[in-house]
């Protein structure tokens, strides 16, 4: 899978906001990812010779990232958790039209939501992109990381925004013997958001 081709696909698929995420135009899949961050992250996972059978995404908005994961990694099961309070959440049915998925609507920290997500475990890829405060990211990690398969990937979005709490969580994860730090993808072409990628090894 060619990195340039992945990045161009993301650029041409449509951005949620050009100032925040870059891209060629606003609209399309309303992706909330910086193209030269999400592209190498996807390539790393695709090249790992590890089948992504089940994908859990926490914090979905319009579904742009879901669309990309479905397109490039083709997981057989897609589970989405979102409280639907994002102003672009109403676009999700159109963005994800034709993509089979289970949507769990509610706050990711709520016990009922965690229990429902657990019914579909294990997951081979989990993306945490919900509450970006340290406490919220920590709760999501504690609640969902045990649902990750051995060898599965854990991605955390917005790692490069210093005023948020994702960076602190990443520093802690680097000391966690159950996880291997793979890389952090930080844009060199646009204002960075950052994606950190880990793999469960224990």
Residue ranges with predicted function:
Residues 1-127, 131-202:
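A short alpha-helical cap/connector motif
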């Amino acid at each position: 899978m060619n990195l340039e081709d992945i990045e161009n696909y993301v650029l041409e698929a449509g951005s949620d906001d050009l100032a925040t995420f870059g891209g060629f135009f606003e609209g399309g899949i309303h992706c909330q990812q910086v193209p030269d961050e999400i592209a190498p992250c996807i390539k790393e996972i695709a090249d790992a010779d590890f089948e992504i059978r089940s994908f859990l995404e926490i914090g979905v908005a319009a579904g742009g990232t879901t669309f990309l994961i479905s397109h490039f990694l083709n997981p057989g099961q897609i589970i989405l958790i979102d409280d639907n309070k994002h102003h672009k959440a109403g676009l999700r049915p159109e963005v994800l039209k034709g993509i089979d998925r289970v949507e769990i609507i509610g706050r990711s920290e709520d016990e009922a939501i965690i229990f429902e997500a657990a019914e579909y475990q294990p997951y081979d890829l989990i993306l945490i992109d919900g509450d970006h405060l340290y406490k919220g990211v920590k709760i999501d990690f504690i609640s969902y990381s045990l649902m990750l398969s051995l060898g599965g990937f854990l991605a955390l979005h917005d790692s490069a925004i210093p005023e948020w709490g994702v960076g602190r969580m990443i520093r802690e994860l680097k000391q966690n013997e159950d996880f291997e730090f793979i890389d952090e993808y930080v844009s060199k072409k646009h204002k960075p958001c950052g994606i950190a990628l880990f793999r469960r090894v224990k």
